[in-house]
């Protein structure tokens, strides 16, 4: 038996990391032109949620972009996944804890994952005080510049929670198909961090930017050739109830003039469903991340 050559997964490493509650599978990738982790270079860093599903997508998107984007800066991708996954799925039950924002003390408990408490605050602390310093130590000579955070679906909702709770945490926030219907649209309630943010973020050059994305077929799907009418109506009813287009548009309209943000962009994929947006918005979001 012969081991794979280093060209199979070059400049990629994996670790299991714990915050004391959950164990994470962290994948870190760095530029192909680096022959050592001690490279002396300025770098941008993108942190990606649901790493089991999206780590390679993010890594390859940066690498495929490099040959045709001559001015692309060096970038490191830090993807946060889990070692234990749901059956036949790239997702873990841990995400329902880590990505879940807290609700007010007098609010009824959320019913999307009954009995699972909020771990959003603890996860922000983990990203900021454990994972990011560790990444900086792993590349001792890198000059770290800007950081971005990407999340899709429930991860996209966490990105919004992090943005309005800790706008200083990342320079660019990328939220794809955020699960805004969660807990009876709690994010639009008077208790949401959307309306309760007193964080001062300094002058315009330090304010974060937000790209919000969704697919045009998420709320209004087309009938598939192989579907019966009954199957289509069932699927259509389920997707319509998620109100992806309505809620993303509503959020964009509410925050597009916000003094908290230096830029807000709404990116619509007219022919994409929910799952496809996860990869599309990540690859396209690189442009926004590097530009803003």
Which stretches of residues belong to each language-model region?
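Non-catalytic cap/lid and distal C-terminal segments of serine-dependent acyl enzymes
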Residues: 1-292
């Amino acid at each position: 038996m012969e081991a794979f050559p280093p060209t199979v997964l070059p400049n990629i490493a994996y670790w299991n990391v714990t915050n004391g509650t959950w164990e994470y599978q962290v994948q870190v990738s760095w530029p192909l032109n680096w022959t050592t982790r001690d490279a002396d270079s300025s770098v941008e860093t993108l942190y990606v949620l649901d790493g089991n599903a999206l780590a390679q997508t993010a890594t390859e998107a940066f690498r495929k972009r490099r040959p045709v984007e001559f001015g692309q800066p060096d970038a490191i991708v830090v993807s946060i996944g889990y070692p234990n996954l749901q059956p036949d799925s790239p997702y873990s039950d841990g995400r329902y804890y880590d990505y879940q924002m807290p609700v007010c003390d007098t609010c009824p408990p959320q019913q999307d994952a009954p009995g699972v408490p909020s771990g959003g605050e603890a996860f922000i602390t983990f990203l900021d005080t454990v994972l990011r310093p560790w990444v900086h130590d792993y590349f001792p000579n890198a000059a770290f510049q800007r950081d971005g955070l990407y999340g899709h679906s429930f991860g996209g909702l966490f990105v919004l929670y992090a943005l309005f709770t800790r706008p200083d945490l990342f320079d660019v926030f990328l939220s794809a198909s955020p699960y805004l219907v969660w807990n009876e649209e709690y994010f639009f309630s008077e208790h949401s961090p959307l309306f309760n943010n007193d964080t001062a973020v300094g002058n315009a050059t330090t304010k974060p930017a937000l790209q919000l994305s969704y697919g045009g077929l998420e709320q209004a799907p087309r009938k598939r050739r192989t579907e019966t009418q009954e199957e289509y109506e069932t699927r259509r009813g389920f997707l319509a109830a998620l109100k992806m287009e309505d809620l993303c548009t509503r959020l964009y309209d509410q925050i597009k003039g916000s003094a908290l943000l230096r830029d807000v962009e709404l990116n619509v994929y007219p022919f994409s469903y929910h799952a496809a947006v996860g990869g599309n918005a990540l690859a396209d979001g690189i442009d926004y991340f590097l530009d803003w």
